[in-house]
Structures are given as structure tokens and as C-alpha cells.
Amino acid sequence: MSDKIRTQLGRVVSDKMDKSIVVAIERMVKHPIYGKFVKRTTKVHAHDENNECGIGDTVEIRECRPLSKTKSWTLVKVVEKAKI
């Protein structure tokens, strides 16, 4: 096993499932020809044991063993709650 646990920061885009959330992770990628930095988004499913997240929250997630067909991340903490 590696010593470093893989963690990411992202924004919750869906919390309609029970004990699950969908997190959008944004990253900047340099265009290979034009050199401009472009935003790319990856959506991952994460486990939220206590259903504490809401849409728009900024969260920290970490990689874990596969929990289902699409879920292999788990919630570490809610960094910032969404402003209503």
C-alpha cells in the first residue's frame, strides 16, 4: 500500500441518493496546441454515511475500496456549507 492517501476537494452536485453523493472535481488542463488553460470536470460518486452533505457544499473526499459498481470514494469532511 502507498503511504499517501489520495484525497480531493470538490463540490456536491447531487445528494438525492441515500448515503451517497455526487461530487464534481474541477481541474485546469493546458490545451496541447493553443496553450490555454481549460477547466475540466470529473464527477465521482462518494459515500456519505450520515447524509450530512447538501447540494453546493465543498467537501473533501478520499479514495477507498470499491463500495459498489460506481462508488469508490468516501467523505472525509465538509469544508464549507453552501450559502442559501
Curated annotation (Swiss-Prot):
Subunit details: Part of the 30S ribosomal subunit.
Source species: Vibrio vulnificus (strain YJ016)
GO CC terms in record: cytosolic small ribosomal subunit
CDD domains xrefs: Ribosomal_uS17
Family designation: Belongs to the universal ribosomal protein uS17 family.
Gene Ontology terms for molecular function: rRNA binding; structural constituent of ribosome
GO biological process, one term: translation
Function: One of the primary rRNA binding proteins, it binds specifically to the 5'-end of 16S ribosomal RNA.
Pfam (any one): Ribosomal_S17
Ribonucleoprotein keyword on record: yes
This protein's UniProt keywords: Ribonucleoprotein, Ribosomal protein, RNA-binding, rRNA-binding
Official protein name in the record: Small ribosomal subunit protein uS17
